[in-house]
Amino acid sequence: MTGLKRGTVMLAPHQEEWAQNAERTIQALNRLLEPVAVDIQHIGSTAIPSIHAKPIIDLVVGVRNLDDIAPYVELLKQHDIVFRGEDVAGQLLFVMGDFEKDTRTHHIHVIKWNGAEWNNYINFRDYLNHFPDKAIEYEACKKKLAAQFADDRWSYTTGKQELIGRLLKEAHTWRSGT
């Protein structure tokens, strides 16, 4: 199952279809954004096979300059990939899903390739995949918050930030080998 009503939180056990779905979507995005996409990666909890995740595929598209994506907004929309704006500073958000049912299946984050946010996404995913105990710690936090905030995605997301910050520091130390 892929997809979740906007604003809600529900975690599901990892499903192999998430990686397959992500790969198909990455291939489609590569075709659509070939001139500007430097790299496209599957990120987020659906990219960590050992943990439960919201059934929404997160992808990150790295570009050299955020302005490079503007000419592609209409083309992406023609392929049911809808621009939602700058969700956080320096990051453009596109979504896919069943908009009539207010369900989202994919969050596509467009950011500066090899910048701080790009490295955060990649390092976090790789760190949790490399260290199962850290993934379990993150999953426990997610499960607790999902039970508490099933209809409040903002509070769920905010509740994870302290742990994510600590794990990111550990991930950067691990990645740099220090």
Features from the language model and the residues they span:
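Conserved catalytic core of two-metal-ion nucleotidyltransferases
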Residues: 80-115
